[in-house]
Amino acid sequence: MQTGKVKWFNSEKGFGFIEVEGGDDVFVHFSAIQGDGFKTLEEGQEVSFEIVEGNRGPQAANVTKN
């Protein structure tokens, strides 16, 4: 599992990016966020996640809020 902070997340479009210290930003789609109800992330929020290879490069999977 990796950890990082949400750089930005657009709730209307359902995606954003997570900052990884010492690494590249990682794309995150709302479908990767674990939990019930409306799936969104807040800027600056700390999260844990796995990195998987998506259609357009690395993206976050199994995202949990810390």
From Swiss-Prot:
Membrane-traversing stretches: none
One Pfam family of this chain: CSD
Transcription regulation listed as a keyword: yes
Keywords in alphabetical order: Activator, Cytoplasm, DNA-binding, Transcription, Transcription regulation
Domain CSD: 4-63
Domain of life: Bacteria
SUPFAM superfamilies named among the record's database cross-references: Nucleic acid-binding proteins
Subcellular location: Cytoplasm
GO cellular component term of the entry, any: cytoplasm
GO MF terms, alphabetically ordered: DNA binding; nucleic acid binding
Complex formation: Homodimer.
Protein name, as recorded: Cold shock-like protein CspD
Organism: Bacillus cereus (strain ATCC 14579 / DSM 31 / CCUG 7414 / JCM 2152 / NBRC 15305 / NCIMB 9373 / NCTC 2599 / NRRL B-3711)
Lineage: Bacteria, Bacillati, Bacillota, Bacilli, Bacillales
Gene: cspD
